[in-house]
Structures are given as C-alpha cells and as structure tokens.
C-alpha cells in the first residue's frame, strides 16, 4: 500500500511541478506579456492601470481604475489576468484583460508592493506587515502568510529553482523563500549601508543578481553633498549567496552622477538598464565589461522598466509625467514618449511632488545627487541618523508634518517653506528663491519664505499634503489598557504628547544630546507619535533602537514619561498602545469582493519548519488548502520502517493505522489551514527518513482512487539520532 501511494504521489508531483512558473516572475510598475504583447503600466497618482498593445507600435487600449494607490503589477498570460498591489486599500486587485475591467480583489497585509505568480500561487510582499502573502491562484483564496525580516518590498521568482527572492527596502538585504516548502531558507546580507532597495534582476548565465540601491554614508561626520549618498548597483553571487563587493557598479563612476536608482532590467545582449527615479534618466551598462554605454533622459520620476525581446525595446514608466518612454535597445536612443495617463492632480500640487522627487535641476541639487526623496522616499523616513551642522539627526517621517510645527528636531523652522535651507545646504542646490535663504541667524528669526517663489510654494504645498494612511481603530484589550496608562498622571505621557497629533509643539530637555555635538543646544521639539511603530530608531540622534529600549534602559530618569516603576504587564500594555497609533490596517478598507475562481481547482501545501531534526529541536508542521469545491482531506505519513499512518484529526493530530481522512467534506472555497504538530522532539522518536503526503480527494472517494485526486503535496524530512 505504501509503495502504491508513494509512486502515484511522486509521478503526479513530477508532472505538476514541471509546469510551475509559467507567469511573469518579476513585478514593478510595468509588466509586459511576451505571449499577448500587452504592456500594463501602474499610475499611482491617477489610481489606475493603463493597458497598451505593443506588438505593432504602441497603442493605449484602456485605463482601468484601481481603488487605493496602485504600486506594482504582474501578468498571468495563461489566465489573462493581471495582479495589482494597492496601498491604502491593502488589497491585491485583479484585472480581467479580456474585458479590461476589475474582476475583484483579495485582502492582503499592510502596504503591499511586490507581486509575482507561478502556476499555483500568487505572492505579495507586505512592506508594513513584514510578511509575504501566498494566495491560491485559481480560487484567489489566501492560503498562508510567510513572516520575513522588516520592510519586504520587491519580489523576483526564479521559475527554474522555485526560489522567491525578497528585497528589504531599508537594509538592501535579500531573503530567499523556497516556494516548494513555503519557508525562508536563507538571507543574503549586503554588508553595507544600502537603502531604497526595491528591484532585483536575475542573471542566470552568470549566476548573479543585480540590485539598484542607494548607499548611505551616515557615519560620515563631515558630510558634503557628494559624500552623503552613492547610487549603486549591487551584485550578488547566487551560488555562494554572498555579495560580490568587487563587482559593485558605482553609477556615478561607470555612467555619471544619478539620483535614486530604483528599477532595472536586462536585455538580450547582457546589458543592464537602470531607471534613476530622481535624476530622470536611464543608465545603460555592459555587464561583460562593467562599462557605461549610455545615459538616456526620460520623463519625470521613472519607476519602472520592461523589456520586449521581440521588438528589442525598453519601456519606461515616467510616473510623474504620466508618460511612457520607448528606448530602442539596439541604437540606445529614446524613440518616442507616449501619453500614459492624465494625472488628476492640481498643477501646483503636482509640481510640488515633482520637485520633491527631483534631483535633475541645478536649483534642487548639484550634479543630480540628492533629492528630498533620497532621505524621505514617498514622504517617509530612511532609518538613518545623519551628522548635520546642528548635530546628529535621525530622519523623521514627513507624514502629517503640516500638523506638527515647529519643524526640525531643534524646532527652529517655523514654516514648511524653510525647506529652502535643506535644498541649498544638504542638496547643494542653488535654491528655489533668489537672494538669501531667509534662515540667518535662524529660520524662525528671519523673514518668511512663503510667497517668494512659485516652486517653493508648490513644494511646501506638497509637504502639507503628506498624510498618514487611515489608522487602525480596533485595539486589543492590552492596547486599551495602555491607552489609559498613556493618558494617566502616572506616566504623564500625554502632558507632552497631546492627541490628536501627539505633540505639544514645544521644545524640551529630556536628557539626550551630547553637548559637544549639539550646536543648537539640548532642547528638542516634541515629535509626534503617530506611526511610531514603523519609524525606528528613536530620539533625535537615533540612539534608541526600539521602543522597549527607549522606555527602559534609556529612561532610568523618567524623562520620557514615568515608566521606571511600571509592572511588566503595564509596560507591555503601554507598548501595545504606542504600536497601535496610526498602525496601517491589514485588509482592504470596505468590501473586497473575491474574483470568481478561474477553474475547478484545488491545492494542498505542507509546511515544515526545517528538513533535518535532532531530539530536543522544535518541529512544526502545518497544512494549507484552498480550492473551488469541497473535498475529503488526507494527511499521510510514512515512517522510517515503511509503516503508513494517517492523521485522523485536525484538532489533536491523532495518528491512525488506517488511511482515513483527516477532515471530511471540507469546503476548500473558504480555505483550510491546520497546524498538525508543534512540539519539541524527545529522544524516543525513531530516527530515520519520513515522508509526508497531503491529498485532497473528491468527497466520498477513496484515497487510492487516483482519478479522484484534486490536489496533493509531498515532503521528506529526517530525524537524526542524538549521537
């Protein structure tokens, strides 16, 4: 009986896994189907996706409205569906390309970005949930969530190996998920100060990966504009899973100074095209010689690239121009720029957003080097502490900044227009106004900058438009108790951090700051606590790595609220409340209607925490299934001696000597997830190799009736002796 099951499972595995990875394996703001010659472009500020036919020329066919703010897109050419991640709504939106209309959506984690799919699953990177969602491709049922390190952003799926590469936005590191085991199996450490890491390009011939990144030189205490950040393409060795430092491509050397390299794509001639979103150009690099071949000017804020091997063209998504640039990959010339969307934004606000993201104008930056977005990408922070003339300064998020005057940690900016000082000093631009910066001897002691130039007014208008995403209004019992503590006289937190902005707009000496480094003294503006769960490190100098450290080891004198005498439970409750402040909600805002299933289909997925075990180690086994119909569900284990047993219950993992279903008549349309084993192995567990099988069978049919199999999965693991 064991051999019969094993042979049938193995044969079906060989057939099914041969066809995994048929869909687009990389996502970004552009996606191209080689099969149908359809090009899809994400328009974040138009809240839409544009659909083009590009086989003969380039023709806009439709523009599909997307709830929330669309981020990235992937095309499934087999089903003629496109998958779009949407921020704010926190959903995966599904477009039916037969009708160029929305087919439905799936709720995912917070701030989703990257999305890719294979023949069985759709994968979504949830940046502010620190996770990857796995969704059954045919039924659109969320199957499981894989926890990863902080701020996962981009995804790249290698269909050959079944490995999913995950970029981490603030560290530049890459996590590797084995999609057959649904586990993070490795992490490639870039060993640098890499930042703004979104895209990853696979080079199978050289067994390499390339990541456009911005390196931060935040340890330098004598910053100049061109020693602050560096535009870089990092090279990874995929065999050794290490960074190849000697093979880094410094774009300011191999090409010319550029700002914020963000996306990249390879053509058929082993040339790498890099979209530089701040300097509004594309760098072209010969990977064989590591030499720059061209620098091509495109539209405003290019954030996405796609290569068409049939026509040998590169498409560029200029998100703040609302256009597509077309590059001839043979001549390395921009041949045309076509309208993608009409951005429905008032001209002053749109101009302000362009200025914020731009380093190409000499008024804004010297030599294309730094934009406002370099440290405040999408208006947020960079997890860095910089040594400025005033002293060490932790980069704050700008979300909600208009509601929290004065500005700067020293509180010496009394209007948003005083950003003119940063444009001239930090970015080394000539400035958006003529004459003085109106910041001598200090910005709050000089004439106002408002009204001095249209560009500066527009930039301030854009800064004022930056707002937090909708807050998570539901609180746990612990968070509610923490709110009471926060507001009580016991802690005194709310005396300075006054709702709704959670600041009093005043400066205080809270015992931080080294006198020799602080040119403007040790009085610091009270920061807002909104969104504090995503803005580590903390304090003006970034000296507190976490909230736990801030309110314990660094608050012995109770200058950040009276916390020294809190019980462990009270301390946990207070942190729960702080972590809940403006926390991005998971799942779509409002009703999210799941798309209709593509076909009668089902899946089964076994997830084991590792493959080799010894007594005393933790073993965790779970099973997940989804589909469009009901099924009887079996989980069978083959012991090292050949004995076959079945899990007879989904509740207590009882093993039966008979091949009975673990669950009868399960509605897979609702999804099915069970943790079967979660234990520490003791020494009397037999050593040897174990085989696990999960099989979904048509209701009422026998396990060994192969024609009745709807889905299956197989895992092998070994328990070694303690010797």
Question: How does the language model describe each region?
Answer:
Residues 154-158, 170, 177-182, 196-232, ...:
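Periplasmic c-type cytochrome electron-transfer domains
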Residues 23, 66, 108, 148, ...:
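Conserved loop/turn at the beginning of each blade in beta-propeller domains
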Residues 625-670:
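Contiguous segments within soluble domain cores/interaction surfaces
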Residues 23-48, 259-262:
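Beta-strand-rich domains and repeat architectures in extracellular enzymes and scaffolds
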Residues 594-619, 716-723:
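Short, compositionally biased P/S/T/A/G/V-rich stretches that sit at domain boundaries
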Residues 35-37, 78-80, 119-120, 160-162, ...:
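Short coil/turn segments that connect the beta-strands within blades of beta-propeller domains
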Residues 702-723:
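Short beta-strand elements
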